[in-house]
Amino acid sequence: MIVVATILLILYIGFIGFVLKKIFEGDAYYLLLYILFTLPFYATFQLIIFKGFDLSALVNVFKYSKDFVFFTAFLVFIFGKKKSFIEYKWELTLLDKLFLGFITLTLIYTLIPLGEAPFLSKIIYAKNTFLIGIVYFLGRHTNIDKQRWRFIVKVLIYLTVGSFLFALSEKIFGTHLQGILDYGRFNLVMNDIFPTGNYGLSWTFERQGGFPRYAAFFSNPLEFAASLLLFLSVGLHYLLHSKYNSNRLAYLCLLLLVTLSFFFSYSRGAIIASGIIVFFTLF
């Protein structure tokens, strides 16, 4: 496992260097590629590194590298442009205003003395919420041409198929990838959380009756199910707007894989959300 972890670290460091280089050149599109190629596997990468090296400090460096990339991209956009940030003419949409209000509420609840959590912990919690706003902000100001968009769609399709195949393999062999990678021990050492449930992972990995829920290469079944909502939206859009019957058949098969993946992850909230997405898409 140490060989796999070493190769993974080398590839990741090289990829981060490439992404940061492109970001400093002013191309925020590569931040989106970073999200697509790393975040779905982020928790699994941490498990592999921990199992390979057994070093908590190394895992923490890896974990916070994501924050470094996002905040660096944000600062480059704010201060690295020839045109001053203040000189921009902002035309806010309803979604922009909702996001701005959401981030403002987060900032207020971080600063006011509410709750028992210490101020440092509140800042750490708020950081993850601010990352959502940063990604939205950068995406809002990134121009993506048709060629790049087609590549993004291909990556999303590969993630859909890949996650289904992983979950199907877990189902067939009656195991969890996280169990193979010692998720229980990782959670105990890194987060001081003891393993729970019938599979030595956490209760998130099973539903009522002790039946397993699978996460594929995502961190847990809930994250897997949430990602399926994005895959569902992509499949529905191209199914309804494709001009060719062969393409429609392919996207119909993709939606079938998404449906089966919902069964593997079994998140009732995500299943209800998928029904809402289908309803508003069709009507």
Task: Explain the meaning of each model-derived region.
Residues M1-L31, T38-L39:
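N-terminal alpha-helical transmembrane segments of multi-pass membrane transport
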Residues Y29-F50, L55-G133:
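N-terminal hydrophobic segments of proteins, predominantly signal-anchor/transmembrane helices
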